[in-house]
Amino acid sequence: MAYQYHNDLLAPYLALSQGDKVQAEYVWIDGDGGLRSKTMTMTKKTTDIGQLRIWDFDGSSTNQAPGGDSDVYLRPAAIFKDPFRGGDNILVLAETFNNDGTPNRTNHRHHTKKVMDLAKDSVPWFGLEQEYTLFDADGTPFGWPKGGFPGPQGPYYCGAGTGKVFARDLIEAHYRACLYAGVNISGINAEVMPSQWEFQVGPCEGISMGDHLWMARYLLVRIAEQWGIKVSFHPKPLAGDWNGAGCHTNYSTKVMREPGGMKYIDEAIEKLSKRHAEHIAVYGEDNDLRLTGRHETGHIGDFSSGVANRGASIRVPRHVAAQGYGYLEDRRPASNIDPYRVTGIIVETTVLDK
């Protein structure tokens, strides 16, 4: 049986005064692409990243260092408000570094920050559509009949009503927590497969896109923990005639967003077509199970683009084509991407001409 939170028992303790002390929850990406966190007591409130101390953790327990040299360092990168503790308490997204000062192998933010700094005059904006699937503690899709299947896809996308959507309370809690924390969440919707949902984050400029998506993920898995529900970011969590889960990446630069920008959108698509294999390599593990040419995807081995075509690698929204400027949507990234790697390679390809 899964452990259930006792929010009623916890509530009176969270209401106690902290005095002048503040709790800072340091959050980082582990060696397997998951999320970890631990808490530090601070002596005063801060909103300045420079006032936060560098911390460390046991990297041998997170697949980030050997046991004989296990210290990995946490360097604060972004601050968010803490929706779990409230008050002046904060969440600190941190980068991981080895003891020699080099970025840990899972620290993709470090490289992408350099890329975004080089491309800052282009003002790259991103909006990511994070799909995910909910599972019961026993590993069955949340809300599905035990030992069976729900009806075929059709009524679930943006659905309303019993039997069409599952765990809306969890999703609403996550939405509000993101807004409170300062995550630039822009929307939510139920997805095509039952118990699959999506939230959107953005527009965010440059490196902040990865920061905000990772923190939104952290909030989601923490809240799901309270519900006793598991969150899967696998791109094809269930075999068969069910949609996979992606992280569609909407992208533009300053010139694309201005009148006449369609020319630059077309140029970006041409550049992306020439590095399809390099992009697929960082667009998520097991993405071949999702990019089959079915279920609103293009085939992983082919590059394609089109207006309003959800079966293409790159989709240009119809309103963008009609007005002649705006953005493109890269539909290839899987739900389990590292957003730093994806946003970084898109800018490298389209702005820095790698």
Curated annotation (Swiss-Prot):
Entry keyword annotation includes Ligase: yes
MF terms in GO: ATP binding; glutamine synthetase activity
Keyword presence, tRNA-binding: no
Catalytic activity: L-glutamate + NH4(+) + ATP = L-glutamine + ADP + phosphate + H(+)
Domain GS catalytic: start-end pairs: 108-354
SUPFAM superfamilies (UniProt xref): Glutamine synthetase, N-terminal domain, Glutamine synthetase/guanido kinase
SMART domains in UniProt: Gln-synt_C
Cross-referenced Gene3D superfamilies: Glutamine synthetase, N-terminal domain, Glutamine synthetase/guanido kinase, catalytic domain
Biological process (GO), any one: glutamine biosynthetic process
Family indicated by similarity: Belongs to the glutamine synthetase family.
PANTHER family in the cross-refs: GLUTAMINE SYNTHETASE, GLUTAMINE SYNTHETASE 2 CYTOPLASMIC
Protein name, entry field: Glutamine synthetase
Taxonomic lineage: Eukaryota, Fungi, Dikarya, Basidiomycota, Agaricomycotina
